[in-house]
Design a protein with these regions (language model features):
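Sec-dependent N-terminal signal peptides
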Residues: 4-13
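Sec/Tat signal peptide C-region and signal peptidase I cleavage site
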Residues: 15-21
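Short, well-ordered beta-strand elements within core beta-sheets of diverse protein domains
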Residues: 125-131
Length: 369
């Protein structure tokens, strides 16, 4: 059967002014009706407008340099060597049907700034699309770029997909005084779906072995048995910074809970979008609704203990029209359905043109979204 990749762009992210409104759904071949891999990518805002970028394929002489401009602001970041061959890119997919999307999770603020870093998250996406053919090669390119030229953005979750595989890569910079980033990448098992929406989602992961490698053995990533890859210093850097106990076991280390701990807004405003998608395709998600509403249980390390799984197996095969509907979900049918409250007006509008939070007598409250 002819393999093809389908990516749904409901709204491409333009200049984003600190909004937490991006959502990605990731679907493997075995989870879809037509055997396609799919990812979605939205920047949900009434003041952002869709756009498509185009980079034609090219062959470049040795010594050619390319300018890097920060995607969000247009700020000049620096130069990096151009690849000898670049691929045709339209939007967030290239001629080899490699596609990349993202949502910003932020994470620990002391890791956001890295003086001299060149590669911001947007440039990382579009440079990689010009240089890689597959999801695995994209992970190599992305992690190599930040190691060589530094990482100039907040923490990011990336969706990376080709016609055969879907991966989630989560990355956060090392802050001032060090170049690069720490990261973990995991392949979504075939037949499963995954999602992220401005909250880091990778928790514990398999340690180095047959199916998992650190970046010390990056060449092994092309072995199809490998389904997890992580930065060689992802544990030691956290211990060095005091984010994880020196005596802490690597086997119980959670990337998200260490580098981007989930709080009330991370659950109620972000993870709840993941829950809505999972709930639409799997009948066993009700126990996680309390967590998605912001009621987080924690262990002695401060790790959340009632989080949703990173991926789930849907009850049925999913088609692209359903995926489009899932991206339009407003928590209909739940107690948080805003189309049914007085503010919805006669047309049951689920939107409210207002900030997400407000204060009364010094106490902060949340608006639903």
């Amino acid at each position: 059967m002819y393999k093809f990749y389908l990516i749904t762009f409901l709204l491409l992210a333009g200049t984003i002014a600190k909004v937490s409104a991006c959502t990605n759904f990731l679907l493997t071949r075995g989870a879809t009706q037509d055997g396609s891999t799919m990812i979605t990518y939205s920047a949900d805002s009434h003041v952002l407008y869709g756009e498509l970028y185009h980079w034609p394929a090219g062959t470049w002489p040795a010594g050619t340099m390319m300018d890097i401009y920060e995607w969000d602001t247009g700020k000049y970041m620096g130069k990096i060597p151009q690849a000898a061959q670049t691929y045709n890119v339209v939007g967030n997919m290239n001629e080899h049907q490699l596609a990349i999307g993202e949502t910003t999770f932020g994470g620990r603020q002391e890791l956001w700034k890295q003086t001299g870093a060149i590669m911001d998250y947007g440039s990382l996406i579009y440079v990689t699309l010009q240089r890689a053919k597959t999801a695995r090669e994209a992970i190599v390119v992305m992690t190599d770029l930040v190691e060589k030229y530094g990482y100039a953005s907040e923490g990011e979750s990336f969706s990376i997909s080709d016609p055969n595989e879907v991966w989630i890569l989560e990355m956060i910079g090392k802050g001032e005084g060090e170049k690069g980033a720490v990261w973990v990448a995991r392949m979504v098992p075939d037949g499963y779906v995954c999602a992220h929406a401005n909250q880091a989602r990778i928790t514990t992961f398999p340690l180095e072995g047959k199916t998992s490698i650190s970046s010390d053995r990056m060449k092994k990533i092309y072995d199809k048995e490998v389904t997890t890859v992580y930065a060689k210093d992802v544990f030691s850097f956290a211990k060095q910074k005091g984010f994880y106990p020196q005596e802490g076991k690597n086997s119980t280390f959670s990337f998200s809970d260490t580098y981007a701990p989930v709080d009330f807004s991370g659950a109620r405003a972000c993870e709840i979008r993941v829950w809505a998608f999972f709930n639409a395709v799997n009948s066993n998600m009700a126990p996680y609704f309390d967590y998605a509403k912001g009621h987080i249980q924690r262990d002695e390390k401060g790790y959340a203990t009632n989080r949703m799984p990173l991926w789930i197996k849907p009850d049925r095969k999913i088609d692209v029209l359903e995926v489009m509907d899932f991206m339009r979900d407003h928590l209909e049918g739940t107690e948080l359905d805003m189309s049914k409250d007085p503010g919805a007006g006669p047309y049951e509008c689920p939107y409210r043109w207002r900030p997400m939070t407000f204060k009364v007598d010094g106490k902060e409250y949340v608006h639903e979204r």
